[in-house]
Amino acid sequence: DCLLSRGLGDVYKRQTIIDSQLRNQNYGFESNIIENHDEPRGVSRFLPEYAHTPSGAKMLGTINVLLRGLPFLYQGQEIGMQNAKWNSIDEFDDISTKDQYHVAKEAGLSDEAALEACSKMSRDNARTPMQWTDGENAGFTTGTPWLKVNSNYTDINVKNQEADEHSVLNYYRKLIAIRKSDEYKNLFTYGEFIPVYDDTESIMAFYRKDESKCVLIAANFGKEPASVTLKSQPARILLSTRPDGNVQIDTTSAPKLTLDSCEAVVIEL
């Protein structure tokens, strides 16, 4: 079940994910998938253009990895790879994309409009070569790759992100380490999923809770900052997508958490 393939772009789609989590947590584990070889890149598919950033990729990954269920990571997801920029239908290999292009043309669309219509959801977006370096063919091969290399490979690649402690790649490593840690692996594997703050339109948030711990996962998908009131003072900040690692919590009265656009936090309460 490609849970996250249902989308996070609006309240209705987020509610679909929540309903599925609540329904299935008593029976087993869902497969939580943002992208695979038959779908476009998750950052490009599920996030608005203002969120096509390292922060957006980290935010999406936080939800994917910490929902109840089995998270699957597809090659390139861990560095935030995005859909390619396609200039011609001849650049595609996928027969379905070519078929959709011809259907669009027969329906009266121009070459440019037909290309735009079919390229956004083309599975070839997830089949471009893995971006290892900023060198020739993104370091994937010295030969001729089966598809063109995404033009953003000089900015998004493993080599650059290995050297950046705040990169998407190193954030995913921290995220996975928390999920697999002796202290939290039972919680994130078997813990209950409890949605919260569903009246705040831009925020998707939930608790993962077991008999001894309660952890809040909250993400702001909106373009502007948003705030929520915490049920208790934080016991521990486990992770934040902010480069400085800080979390904005006002503790002058009831603790209030403020999330910037595309910010996600993991907080033990």
At which residue positions do the language-model features occur?
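Active-site clefts of carbohydrate-active enzymes
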Residues: 29-51
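Loop/helix patches that line or flank the sugar-binding groove of alpha-linked glycan CAZymes
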Residues: 17, 51-215, 221-226
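Solvent-exposed beta-strand/loop surfaces of large extracellular or lumenal domains
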Residues: 238-254
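Glycoside hydrolase catalytic-domain groove-lining segments
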Residues: 10-27
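Beta-strand-rich binding/interaction modules
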Residues: 225-243
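C-terminal beta-strand-rich structural cap/linker in extracellular carbohydrate-active enzymes
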Residues: 250-269
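Residues immediately flanking
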Residues: 36, 221, 269
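Single conserved hydrophobic/aromatic residue that forms the stacking wall/gate
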Residues: 1-12
